[in-house]
Amino acid sequence: MKKTATALFSLLLAISALNAQGQTKTYDISGTVVDSLSSEPLPGVYVTAGSKGGQTNGDGHYVIKNVPAGKVTLKTMYYSSYPTATREIELTGDTTVDFILAEQIFNINEVVVTGTRTEKRLAEAPVLTTVIGEREIEKAGSVSMLESLQDNIPGIVISPNAMGNNMRIKGLNSRYILMLVDGERLVSEGAGGNVNLDQIDVNNIERIEMINGAASALYGSNAVGAVINVITKKPVHKFEADANASWANHNTWRTRLSAGTNLKKFSARASGFRNSSDGFGGDGEGAYAAAYEDYGATLNMGYRPTDRSDVNVVGRFFSHETFNPTGSMNASHALSHNLSLGANGGLSSADKRNSMRLSVNFDKYFDYEVLEKKNDTKNKDNTSSYISARFIDTFIPTAKWELIGGLEYNHEENFATSTLGATPTTKTLDDANVFAQAEYEILKNFDAVAGARYTYNSQFGSAFTPKLSLMYEVAEWRFRGGVGTAFRAPSIKELYYDFDHQGMFWVYGNPELKAEKGLYSSLSAEYTEGLLNVSVSAYYNNINNKITQYDVINAAGGNEKYYKNVSSATLRGIDVTFSYLFSKHLAVRANYSFCDAVDNSTGLQLEDNVKHSGTVSLTWNGRIARSPFSLQIAGRMNSPKLYQQIITGSDGSQTVSMEESDPYSIWKIVLVKPFRINKHTIEVTFKVDNLFNFREASFVDPGRQFLIGIRYAFK
């Protein structure tokens, strides 16, 4: 018995010793977090160490207790204007780790991809790129992507017409502006090339990148006037979620939910939104906007089998329904759906010098007529679809060279019940592309990028579009220059339209149309010194073979409309940007644009062109209850919109009709106040838009509006 007890006691001692050896020691990590500019402590910063974390107090001090010894990665989480800071340490005892966080005022350290299809710091990008970041969108209280663009890019004009909201930038309409989401093209929804930007959830935008001028060498057709690429948010935490709700005049509601996860090999993000409004006007006097109801949902999933490979899938759905005003005699209203599906995968070599990516994307637009007197039966009027497949290989043979080559195939299809002929008809277009680009560091601070694309289109044949960009950097100056070509393929509607427009006129397409060709050149200088950033750029854009619609009076006196390649246009202008942090609290941004956009066949300005335009914002970044807030006053100013045309009289004489809108400026004031408690953030937004209640016949706006919004986020 005694021997048995002794053996049991010895066994217990051995197990205890083994447990003691197996237990990982834990230590505390502490430190302070301060602002880089003011050196003031930052309360409310959440610092994580794996699954553990701690939040800074009023003195900027934090403590994370019982962190297992070994390699530890520390991360800060604060308001979006302060980027996440990361520190890796080897924890062998109680340790002090301090952080100095810099609030990002400029975007020069932002990583961009649109100008070269490769990741570059904005300051190092050879192609001049405009970036609208998440923090600018939040501080401006923007509720839509369109508002974000108007707040930051001068010269954007929205002109409602029978084909939707036509967006013009520097005299060129939607046909010449290529819209992308994460590098993939959005299908246009009408003959005007319009894209409903409300399908993009503004709360899901990480940043918006825009490059001006010809970019067909990388992106193909339509990249004539500008390329706008929306980069969506990716999950960064093990679990994150947020919810938004806002209300504005005319019973305008915007609500949204999202959740995401980022694990070792798997990531996913799902979001959904509902927007609605009672609209305004409809009495025949003044501006009018229909009541509407929108729904949208997005799902992104990614898998990383190894640190050198990844596979991603994305799905997006959007529904937009507009309603007739009270008392309307219309027996139907419009409904549209957008569906996008995509997948891509990448593989890189062990030394990261070579990487390949294959992507496939499908985007389809459905147009319905809802028959109100037939139990809201839906009649499908039109569909537009776009399928794109792309392979890209990026190779970095030396530190001075970066090479890109790729293949691309695109298939476009339109179905219409009546506009492509008297019977339901389907028309298609295909194009195959090969493209290449080489970037070379000629000297230490002198880079050159040359690229070209060859396109074979099933309708008009071949197009070759080369491009060259240069950048030279000296001290605080960056000089960029470039020349490039672009093309716009005629749309299916311009080629094959054949319909009677409610007895008022006939519209006929022209299958013999050729592609429009553009030649773009630009020079720019950028200066950055401390808290000041200024840039000046000049450009010249000449577009030939411009497709124009013209009228013919037939023998019966009826009006017939046709398309032909008869005109050309020349755009020349100057853009100026200015950003400065006057103190640790006040940030000032201003943008000015001059654009002379001439239709060379008439010598007149392009329709809706605005010669002078600008945007300005003053943002006060202060503190309430020792936590930050922002107060912004922002405005956008436009000279008159120009409407010029030549009218031919019955005797053959020609007169020039010239009309213009009033010049205008639209101002808003926005207060954004976040509250942070550990991993939780509550943010309240108050906004007064169109502060001075500007109204004008050509300007579709309900006048002064008030908005209140609230957002909750967990990370």
How would you describe each model-predicted region?
Residues 9, 260, 302-304, 484, ...:
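Conserved C-terminal beta-signal and adjacent last beta-strands/turns
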Residues 32-40, 46-48, 75-82, 92-138, ...:
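Short, acidic, small-residue-rich periplasmic hinge/interaction motif at the N-terminus
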Residues 129, 146-184, 188:
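Extracytoplasmic beta-strand/coil segments of soluble accessory domains associated
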Residues 277-296, 304-386:
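Flexible loop and strand-edge segments within Gram-negative outer membrane beta-barrel domains
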Residues 441-447, 540-542, 564-644:
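Gram-negative outer-membrane beta-barrel transporters
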Residues 199-240:
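A beta-strand signature from Gram-negative outer-membrane beta-barrel systems
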Residues 65-66, 147, 184-212:
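Short acidic/polar hinge/loop motifs at secondary-structure boundaries
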